[in-house]
UniProtKB/Swiss-Prot annotation:
A motif (Beta-hairpin) lies at residues 92-115. The keyword Cytoplasm applies. The UvrABC repair system catalyzes the recognition and processing of DNA lesions. A damage recognition complex composed of 2 UvrA and 2 UvrB subunits scans DNA for abnormalities. Upon binding of the UvrA(2)B(2) complex to a putative damaged site, the DNA wraps around one UvrB monomer. DNA wrap is dependent on ATP binding by UvrB and probably causes local melting of the DNA helix, facilitating insertion of UvrB beta-hairpin between the DNA strands. Then UvrB probes one DNA strand for the presence of a lesion. This is UvrABC system protein B. One of its GO terms (cellular component) is cytoplasm. Residues 431-597 form the Helicase C-terminal domain. Residues 633-668 form the UVR domain.
Length: 673
């Protein structure tokens, strides 16, 4: 099933890319465990990594610091490798409240979660691809270091069907039930099967648009065919098919029976300890909860919160690392850590927070001590499991630099010839008035401005001040959710307003070629918001515009400012020299505005949660100008229905696009009436 990686791109590597690709590939072939790619904003870091993957033909996992950047990378990799398996693995919770106990108020908070079915399907598809093929790129968030089902047990549970095999229909149904598939003859959806005479239709858990039909004749598999579950149309007939479990946490019956005995032993030992310490309430609570879980496991093969018994189910010893996505990656796999200066500290912090919450649950009799082993990886375990690694960042952290032995692969020259912004330092005393005049200059020539402040209060006051002086300004703060944030960024790019004020939200991975000025207020106040890395990242937001400029307002030049200015000037010098030698004139990026909202276009545009295929979206600017009022009214009614459908499918970006078009249509309707 595997194919060789085939890179699809109209561009050839240019600028610093060919040298970066050569050095990274040499390092990997020489067996270097750690390498760092220092790639400035807009230098094509993803393209460089895609070239390395295609040249070396190795399965790869790309770690991103959050879902938004993971979706952006997934979209880019999908374009680079349309014929290969590009998969997406992030947390499938839309909402997650872990179980917790607050001793001070004697409050127990039950686990409460809302699972996004579409992302669950993509996670299952990712592990299936990792087990079946070598031409796989999995883009994952830090969710990859959390416990997952053991790959060995997962493989043992698979159901293989081949044409001509002798198998009883009831045996197939029993095996499907063990894989946690549910029979549903009415609503045929992901993770279910239906039976009609000697025909069994199975909707694989990892698929979103293809189902399997098994036709039996007297205990023999006569035909296997793939069909569209929506239309029932046969797509192809196949000689064999493998059905994977519905969940990563599925376990063979004999392993469950063995695990139950081990759980009973631990329960007896723990009860003894609690009674010796006169903790009668905790002992009774633990006994009641564990006995209930054991009965559920005995009857159904699983229970709510079964992940708390994962140590027994995977057969691992106390304190051993849980099985994670890394266990599914082949031994010669490659790990790419994107925005490593953010991702690496995140990995280090996950274990400690999880541990503190679970210790309270164990102490007060809500969980057995073995629940502590259902956890994310410790940092040292992550280091031990990680294959050959490339850290990618515009501002690598000390950890990455130390691991790479100070030998950093530089990717400073952009293929477009764009230079790093010019930096100016100006006094704090007149910063607001000076900023106002700079904003007016930029707004007059249809360019945008980003302003970063130190405090929420200052951001609010500045926004109010700029509004009073007639500027079109918005404030981006931490209470805004991801989708709304993307809408604000899109509106900035479309020119709905000229200035965006924020605190710490203007750093990694924001693509805005229209921004020609970044203003950093109180740049001389040392701290994490004004550290060398933060300053370089923020300055980089203006690096996608030909007229890019950064103004740092400060009365003195701090060590962080000096380093950030020095590094930016070093890069600018190198870029200028390259441009002169090769006769390159810097060109602004002409990135379509919809691109930023198509972060994970392949995620949103696939079939949404079994509700039928998403309908194509009409571009907001394709509004017919010569429609009659009646036709406009009909069009508005149609689009309102489509907008609600997208919102229901959680495709908020598409819904927002239609909302903008509706706004234009309503204005036309009023004018025409």
């Amino acid at each position: 099933m595997s194919k060789p990686f085939k890179l699809n791109s109209a561009f050839k590597p240019s600028g610093d890319q060919p040298e970066a690709i050569r050095r990274l590939e040499e390092g990997l072939e020489d067996g270097l465990a750690h390498q760092t790619l220092l790639g400035v904003t807009g230098s094509g870091k993803t393209f460089t990594i895609a070239n390395v993957i295609a040249d070396l033909q190795r399965p790869t996992m790309v770690l991103a610091p959050n879902k938004t950047l993971a979706a952006q990378l997934y979209g880019e990799m999908k374009e680079f490798f349309p014929e290969n398996a590009v998969e997406y693995f992030v947390s499938y919770y839309d909402y997650y409240q872990p179980e917790a106990y607050v001793p001070s108020s004697d409050t127990f908070i039950e686990k409460d979660a809302s699972v996004n079915e579409h992302i669950e399907q993509m996670r299952l598809s990712a592990t299936k691809a990792m087990l079946e093929r070598r031409d796989v790129v999995v883009v994952a968030s830090v969710s990859a270091i959390y416990g997952l089902g053991d790959p060995d047990l997962y493989l043992k549970m698979m159901l293989h069907l081949t044409v001509g095999m002798i198998i009883d229909q009831r045996a197939i149904l029993r095996r499907l039930a063990e894989l946690q598939y549910a029979r549903n003859d009415q609503a045929f959806q992901r993770g279910t099967f239906r039976v009609r005479g000697e025909v069994i239709d199975i909707f694989p858990a990892e698929s979103d648009d293809i189902a399997l039909r098994v036709e039996l004749f007297d205990e023999e598999v006569e035909r296997l065919s793939l069909f569209d579950p929506l239309t029932g149309q046969i797509v192809s007939t196949i000689p064999r098919f493998t059905i994977y479990p519905k969940t990563h946490y599925v376990t063979p019956r004999e392993r469950i029976v063995q695990a139950m005995e081990e759980i009973k032993e631990e329960l007896a030992a723990r009860r003894k300890v609690l009674l010796e310490n006169n903790k009668l309430l905790e002992e009774q609570r633990l006994t009641q909860r564990t006995q209930f879980d054991l009965e559920m496991m005995n009857e159904l093969g699983y229970c709510s919160g079964i992940e708390n018994y994962s140590r027994f189910l995977s057969g691992r010893g106390p304190g051993e690392p849980p099985p994670t996505l890394f266990d599914y990656l082949p031994a010669d796999g490659l790990l790419v850590v994107d925005e490593s200066h953010v991702t690496i500290p995140q990995i280090g912090g996950m274990y400690r927070g999880d541990r503190a919450r679970k210790e309270t649950l164990v102490e007060y009799g809500f969980r057995l001590p073995s629940a502590l082993d259902n956890r994310p990886l410790k940092f040292e375990e992550f280091e031990a499991l990680a294959p050959q690694t490339i850290y990618v960042s515009a501002t690598p952290g000390n950890y990455e630099l130390e691991k790479s032995g100070g030998d950093v692969v530089d990717q400073v020259v952009r293929p477009t010839g764009l230079l790093d912004p010019i930096i100016e330092v100006r006094p704090v005393a007149t910063q607001v008035d000076d900023l106002l005049s700079e904003i007016r200059q930029r707004a007059a020539i249809n360019e945008r401005v980003l302003v970063t402040t130190l405090t929420k209060r200052m951001a609010e006051d500045l926004t109010e001040y700029l509004e009073e002086h007639g500027e079109r300004v918005r404030y981006l703060h931490s209470d805004i959710d991801t989708v709304e944030r993307m809408e604000i960024i899109r509106d900035l790019r479309l020119g709905e307003f000229d200035v965006l004020v924020g605190i710490n939200l203007l750093r990694e991975g924001l693509d805005m070629p229209e921004v020609s000025l970044v203003a950093i207020l109180d740049a001389d106040k040392e701290g994490f918001l004004r550290s060398e890395r933060s300053l370089i990242q923020t300055i980089g937001r203006a690096a996608r515009n030909v007229n890019g400029k950064a103004i740092l307002y400060g009365d003195k030049i701090t060590p962080s400012m000096a380093k950030a200015i020095g590094e930016t000037e070093r890069r600018r010098e190198k870029q200028q020299k390259y441009n002169e030698e090769h006769g390159i004139t810097p060109q602004g990026l002409n990135k379509k505005v919809v691109d930023i909202l198509a972060l994970g276009q392949n995620i949103a545009k696939t079939k949404a949660k079994g509700r039928g295929k998403s309908r194509p979206i009409v571009e907001p600017d394709n509004v017919p100008m010569d429609m009659s009022p009646k036709a406009l009214q009909q069009k508005i009614h149609e689009l309102e229905g489509l907008m609600m459908q997208h919102a229901q499918n959680l495709e908020f970006e598409e819904a927002a696009q239609i909302r903008d078009q509706l706004h234009q249509l309503r204005e036309l309707f009023i004018a025409a009436s």
